[in-house]
């Protein structure tokens, strides 16, 4: 049965146009073609990325944070309380008023003390400013290098300027070492993002992040299997064009450089809209949906690839909505902070802030300006 499933999975009609077989893509006459076995290396490379990231954050990002004067906020810790901790872990982090009253009776604390405990406990679980800065530094470094590498791999190719050449001779298109390594490194990086997502800074579009990472990995794997390598390299280079701008804006945001952060955000928003909402649908998607049909009848691989492209495009539209809304409020002077951000909760509104707490709050508010996230925009 397993052999039957294996044979069906690799059935040529799922992956290749009619009248073509895997034998047509065997290496010969010095020409090398993409193979599924090539991707085995991406998993150990993903683990290597995690190791490199650890040392980068420790020996590069942390000293850089100190140089830019990235300061932590002093957080008041919730005192140990077994009753409240059990509820926090099992029932929820934000109890309703009726639950606050019940917990007050069970713990012997006043309702106000219970609410204060949960605020402090939630703040304990929020990532520190240094953690956010180190994560943004790592992603900025990778995305900048990846964008430069992507341009180097694609800009001298004829299909960079004439998208019809993406399909010229398809699928009998050999690959060169630069394309191979560009694919392996990009796929390895996205594997590493998926592996570390549970420990990374969790934002409110966490589910969209997972969908994006999974869709990207599937697209990269499928495009390699089916030898959509020319289209794949263009898509990766286009995606990396805006990500490093976003991560650099976040770094300056955490460092308190408001003007630099805001200016970089505006540049990021412009580049994101141009690349994801203009070039992607009207050039790249047109290239992958229309041009292949001029050469071959539609086949499963054609539909599957373009379906996954449509999933990515929907995520682009989702994120662009928030970017444009933020940009509008930013321009009109109404934006105080990112509406979707996971804000630190303060106690000053209820008159509970001590002198030390007030000092900490003033440091927090100095960091209250807009920023989005990553390979796909998210919020801090």
Swiss-Prot record:
Query: Catalytic activity, per the record?
Result: a very long-chain fatty acyl-CoA + a sphingoid base = an N-(very-long-chain fatty acyl)-sphingoid base + CoA + H(+); docosanoyl-CoA + sphinganine = N-docosanoylsphinganine + CoA + H(+); tetracosanoyl-CoA + sphinganine = N-tetracosanoylsphinganine + CoA + H(+); hexacosanoyl-CoA + sphinganine = N-hexacosanoylsphinganine + CoA + H(+)
Q: Which GO terms describe its molecular function?
A: DNA binding; N-acyltransferase activity; sphingosine N-acyltransferase activity
Give the main localization category: endoplasmic reticulum
Q: What does its PTM field state? A: Acetylated. Deacetylation by SIRT3 increases enzyme activity and promotes mitochondrial ceramide accumulation.
Parts of the chain on the Lumenal side: 1-40
Which pathway is it part of? Lipid metabolism; sphingolipid metabolism
Record key words, sorted? Acetylation, Endoplasmic reticulum, Glycoprotein, Lipid biosynthesis, Lipid metabolism, Membrane, Phosphoprotein, Transferase, Transmembrane, Transmembrane helix
Where's it found, cell-wise? Endoplasmic reticulum membrane
What are the annotated disulfide bridges? none
Region Homeobox-like, residue ranges: 67-128
EC number(s)? 2.3.1.24, 2.3.1.297
Q: How does it sit in the membrane?
A: Multi-pass membrane protein
The UniProt note on how this protein's activity is regulated states: Ceramide synthase activity is inhibited by sphingosine-1-phosphate.
According to its UniProt entry, the function of this protein is described as: Ceramide synthase that catalyzes the transfer of the acyl chain from acyl-CoA to a sphingoid base, with high selectivity toward very-long-chain fatty acyl-CoA (chain length C22-C27). N-acylates sphinganine and sphingosine bases to form dihydroceramides and ceramides in de novo synthesis and salvage pathways, respectively. Plays a non-redundant role in the synthesis of ceramides with very-long-chain fatty acids in kidney, liver and brain. Regulates the abundance of myelin-specific sphingolipids galactosylceramide and sulfatide that affects myelin sheath architecture and motor neuron functions.
Q: What is the recorded name of this protein? A: Ceramide synthase 2
In its UniProt entry, the species of origin is given as Mus musculus
Lineage runs: Eukaryota, Metazoa, Chordata, Craniata, Vertebrata
């Amino acid at each position: 049965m397993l052999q039957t499933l294996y044979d069906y999975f690799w059935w040529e009609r799922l992956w290749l146009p009619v009248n073509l077989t895997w034998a047509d893509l065997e290496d010969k006459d010095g020409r090398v073609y993409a193979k599924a076995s090539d991707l085995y290396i991406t998993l150990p490379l993903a683990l290597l990325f995690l190791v490199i990231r650890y040392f980068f954050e420790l020996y590069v990002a942390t000293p850089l944070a100190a140089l830019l004067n990235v300061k932590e906020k002093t957080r008041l810790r919730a005192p140990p309380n077994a009753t409240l901790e059990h509820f926090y872990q099992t029932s929820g982090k934000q109890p309703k008023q009726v639950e606050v009253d019940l917990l007050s009776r069970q713990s012997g604390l006043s309702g106000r003390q219970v609410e204060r405990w949960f605020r402090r406990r939630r703040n304990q679980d929020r990532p520190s400013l240094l953690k956010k800065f180190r994560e943004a530094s790592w992603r900025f470094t990778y995305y900048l290098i990846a964008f430069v590498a992507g341009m180097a791999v694609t800009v001298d190719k004829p299909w960079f300027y004439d998208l019809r050449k993406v399909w010229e001779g398809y699928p009998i298109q050999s690959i060169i070492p630069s394309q191979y390594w560009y694919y392996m490194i990009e796929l390895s990086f996205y594997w590493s993002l998926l592996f570390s997502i549970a420990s990374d800074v969790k934002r409110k579009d966490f589910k969209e992040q997972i969908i994006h990472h999974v869709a990207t990995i599937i697209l990269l794997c499928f495009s390699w299997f089916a030898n959509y390598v020319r289209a794949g390299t263009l898509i990766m280079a286009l995606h990396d064009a805006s990500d490093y701008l976003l991560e650099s804006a976040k770094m300056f945001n955490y460092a308190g450089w408001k003007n630099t952060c805001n200016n970089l955000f505006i540049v990021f928003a412009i580049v994101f809209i141009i690349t994801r909402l203009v070039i992607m649908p009207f050039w790249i998607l047109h290239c992958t949906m229309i041009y292949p049909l001029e050469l071959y009848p539609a086949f499963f691989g054609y539909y599957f690839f373009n379906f996954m492209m449509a999933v990515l495009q929907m995520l682009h539209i989702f994120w662009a909505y928030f970017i444009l809304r933020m940009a509008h409020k930013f321009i009109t002077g109404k934006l105080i902070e990112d509406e979707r951000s996971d804000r630190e909760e303060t106690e000053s509104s209820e008159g509970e802030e001590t002198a030390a707490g007030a000092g900490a709050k003033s440091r927090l508010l100095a960091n209250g300006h807009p920023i989005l996230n990553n390979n796909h925009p998210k919020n801090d």
